[in-house]
């Protein structure tokens, strides 16, 4: 009898974390690697937030708090939704967890039974399918490639709904594409949902504050208040405030769902870190004046990366409305040979080639459920980003154009 549960047969380690691990190993060995794989901001946590955490430590705020988060933080979250999204939530409709990932994990553990289906537009954040599978649910993938602007249409959604559908996942702005749903697109999705009252929606809004070109962010519950009881919204402090390591995420939804998720959390991590909660209160209640400049900085990096990668004849690039990723179509390079004679057959091969030849770490598109693409994160310095993109361009220029998987001369 194996000590390892068969539950793990249905899931795999995070491929993005695997890329980060390999990159760190190469850097430690002295290799000049530029890492474009990590999904976290490159600026530091603002000083006022750090000072709030230091004060909490000095004040001895180091004990257990409420399992679902301390009331002061939940009040700050409630105020945030009213101030920024014009949505009213009660404190018992809010849960705080150890990062947005735990919020989502709790959600599916508390709501899915075997046979329940979850519609996941592809490409998707790598953890969605595995968390659904761990919760005995069944992921249902709907391909939304560059020809669809990486977004799920109302028509594609309706075709995917069955009597077993329990959840739809919407991530806007998206990881890995940066694609963002506008008012009309969300309104059309809401029209479909009104026809199917058994379908709930998880709206992952973690990149809410990183949008470009005057794009106006909307969350689904804001557009369809009549569906509020069926919409669970996930957010957190990781991206807007560069607090990925502080591990504070939050979710808002129906009282019954929050109560069930709190039970799950009480038997896993219990409360989130008390010190991080105090820091999160300051992030939400304190100055917000650095958010727009940081987003503008990301926009400049997006434009720089696009200006270089668009020169590569094998690539097709989508101009994202938010987040800090490019999801580049690269299938035209498949079938061609590298200088060493190896044929690039898929996105894994191409990512390996860029790591070996260009010394640039990217994440293959298949990790996000869509072959024929690769993801870069431009959350790095302008200088490093420019050098990385030039290296990618140069590496693609040295690939043979005469060989293909079909055996063409």
UniProtKB/Swiss-Prot annotation:
<feature type="binding site">
    <location>
        <position position="125"/>
    </location>
    <ligand>
        <name>L-aspartate</name>
    </ligand>
</feature>
<feature type="binding site">
    <location>
        <position position="375"/>
    </location>
    <ligand>
        <name>L-aspartate</name>
    </ligand>
</feature>
<comment type="function">
    <text>Catalyzes the reversible conversion of aspartate and 2-oxoglutarate to glutamate and oxaloacetate. Can also transaminate prephenate in the presence of glutamate.</text>
</comment>
<dbReference type="GO" id="GO:0005737">
    <property type="term" value="C:cytoplasm"/>
</dbReference>
<dbReference type="InterPro" id="IPR004838">
    <property type="entry name" value="NHTrfase_class1_PyrdxlP-BS"/>
</dbReference>
<feature type="binding site">
    <location>
        <position position="175"/>
    </location>
    <ligand>
        <name>L-aspartate</name>
    </ligand>
</feature>
<keyword id="KW-0663">Pyridoxal phosphate</keyword>
<dbReference type="GO" id="GO:0006520">
    <property type="term" value="P:amino acid metabolic process"/>
</dbReference>
<dbReference type="InterPro" id="IPR015422">
    <property type="entry name" value="PyrdxlP-dep_Trfase_small"/>
</dbReference>
<feature type="modified residue" description="N6-(pyridoxal phosphate)lysine">
    <location>
        <position position="239"/>
    </location>
</feature>
<keyword id="KW-0963">Cytoplasm</keyword>
<keyword id="KW-0808">Transferase</keyword>
<dbReference type="GO" id="GO:0030170">
    <property type="term" value="F:pyridoxal phosphate binding"/>
</dbReference>
<feature type="site" description="Important for prephenate aminotransferase activity">
    <location>
        <position position="12"/>
    </location>
</feature>
<dbReference type="InterPro" id="IPR015421">
    <property type="entry name" value="PyrdxlP-dep_Trfase_major"/>
</dbReference>
<feature type="binding site">
    <location>
        <position position="39"/>
    </location>
    <ligand>
        <name>L-aspartate</name>
    </ligand>
</feature>
<comment type="subunit">
    <text>Homodimer.</text>
</comment>
<dbReference type="GO" id="GO:0033854">
    <property type="term" value="F:glutamate-prephenate aminotransferase activity"/>
</dbReference>
<keyword id="KW-0032">Aminotransferase</keyword>
<protein>
    <recommendedName>
        <fullName>Probable aspartate/prephenate aminotransferase</fullName>
        <ecNumber>2.6.1.1</ecNumber>
        <ecNumber>2.6.1.79</ecNumber>
    </recommendedName>
</protein>
<dbReference type="InterPro" id="IPR004839">
    <property type="entry name" value="Aminotransferase_I/II_large"/>
</dbReference>
<dbReference type="GO" id="GO:0004069">
    <property type="term" value="F:L-aspartate:2-oxoglutarate aminotransferase activity"/>
</dbReference>
<dbReference type="GO" id="GO:0009058">
    <property type="term" value="P:biosynthetic process"/>
</dbReference>
<dbReference type="Pfam" id="PF00155">
    <property type="entry name" value="Aminotran_1_2"/>
</dbReference>
<dbReference type="InterPro" id="IPR050596">
    <property type="entry name" value="AspAT/PAT-like"/>
</dbReference>
<dbReference type="InterPro" id="IPR015424">
    <property type="entry name" value="PyrdxlP-dep_Trfase"/>
</dbReference>
<comment type="similarity">
    <text>Belongs to the class-I pyridoxal-phosphate-dependent aminotransferase family.</text>
</comment>
